[in-house]
Amino acid sequence: MNFTKSEALHKEALEHIVGGVNSPSRSFKAVGGGSPVAMERGKGAYFWDVDGNKYIDYLAAYGPIITGHAHPHITKAITTAAENGVLYGTPTALEVKFAKMLKEAMPALDKVRFVNSGTESVMTTIRVARAYTGRTKIMKFAGCYHGHSDLVLVAAGSGPSTLGTPDSAGVPQSIAQEVITVPFNNVETLKEALDKWGHEVAAILVEPIVGNFGIVEPKPGFLEKVNELVHEAGALVIYDEVITAFRFMYGGAQDLLGVTPDLTALGKVIGGGLPIGAYGGKKEIMEQVAPLGPAYQAGTMAGNPASMASGIACLEVLQQKGVYEKLDELGAMLEKGILEQATKHNIDITVNRLKGALTVYFTTNTIEDYDAAKNTDGEMFGRFFKLMLQEGINLAPSKYEAWFLTTEHTKEDIEYTIEAVGRAFAALADNK
């Protein structure tokens, strides 16, 4: 493939935009460098870049585009909203309708509030939990990303009984000291941390199914134990379902797994591709939020008609019969084909899949926590990523990210992708 225009555009972008990208995950730094491909148009499961190259897209904008690009039902809803004015600064019927849809889909949401991003929704659930409990410390699991606010850009300390350290320049040590990080899927270290800090903990942040170091499911009974131990300590359980809500079923991962949190943060899929976030939970906790309570949260763009209309339309598409069964069927087909090609070409991989999302790790080890994901072969993934790009397959440029299927992918797309994987694995095998 020819990437001349993408390369020229990136060179120009570097003169005007920091790092040439508006989110570091779009850079090719994690896959060996080079100019990221600039896309010009998306339709269904496909992308076309500025050079005219066509791709089957498994990035799906890191998850939100579950109905494919430019879905006609969603596009019509956005267009209608735009024609009626995109921002009012007043209540609307659309926000009430959308809130009711979310509550019906996720029974743990007694009350909801709309914001503008997943980062905002997580940030606000933390504030609400602190207001409700009167405590300040937060717990999270290593490797789980909860947005770019100072509150959660925190790395693990030297052990579960130590406090966190900043995971970004500009995050004060004093804020990091309010966060305790423990390994995912490890009850003993969670218990050890709670034994020491539990009386100061306001809440624990949980990705019920991890999406930020690949697709990693909880061990049987792990989430139930988290609820038990955290509630015993007098703290709240917050589920970050920014990636997982409406991805695996119509509703949340909490409903798929049968475990109920106190608060839930939402984003990505629920906006149908437009900026959005939402949070909700138990009535008595949510009533801490202004104007009813002392926990302040506001937003000029929150609940804007365009995002509400897009979100409603997206959920209407996902309500249709057979949507999630199709995603699961295609996901299973893709996983099987990738594993067969790996065996054929003697490439060591592990695939973690849940329904229509999967991650390919270059390792033979089981991936159940961040340390295991971190120790996979990133150099091999980088080579694989660029080989797949040449084959017309668009993946996330990071070994940690998932492949996301959409309602618009077809069996023919999967068959071609498996063939492309085979050619990429053959090239990797030739250059071991």
From Swiss-Prot:
GO terms for molecular function: glutamate-1-semialdehyde 2,1-aminomutase activity; pyridoxal phosphate binding; transaminase activity. It comes from the Bacteria. It catalyses: (S)-4-amino-5-oxopentanoate = 5-aminolevulinate. The keyword RNA-binding does not apply. Keywords: Cytoplasm, Isomerase, Porphyrin biosynthesis, Pyridoxal phosphate. InterPro entries: 4pyrrol_synth_GluAld_NH2Trfase, Aminotrans_3, Aminotrans_3_PPA_site, PyrdxlP-dep_Trfase, PyrdxlP-dep_Trfase_major, PyrdxlP-dep_Trfase_small. It holds the Pfam family Aminotran_3. Its cofactor is pyridoxal 5'-phosphate. GO terms for biological process: protoporphyrinogen IX biosynthetic process. Its EC number is 5.4.3.8. PROSITE patterns: AA_TRANSFER_CLASS_3 (PS00600). The modification N6-(pyridoxal phosphate)lysine is found at residue 268. It is found in: Cytoplasm. Pathway: Porphyrin-containing compound metabolism; protoporphyrin-IX biosynthesis; 5-aminolevulinate from L-glutamyl-tRNA(Glu): step 2/2. The keyword Metal-binding does not apply. Gene3D superfamilies: Aspartate Aminotransferase, domain 1, Type I PLP-dependent aspartate aminotransferase-like (Major domain). GO terms for cellular component: cytoplasm. HAMAP family: HemL_aminotrans_3. PANTHER family: GLUTAMATE-1-SEMIALDEHYDE 2,1-AMINOMUTASE, GLUTAMATE-1-SEMIALDEHYDE 2,1-AMINOMUTASE 2. Belongs to the class-III pyridoxal-phosphate-dependent aminotransferase family. HemL subfamily. Homodimer. This is Glutamate-1-semialdehyde 2,1-aminomutase 1. It comes from Bacillus mycoides (strain KBAB4) (Bacillus weihenstephanensis). The gene is hemL1.
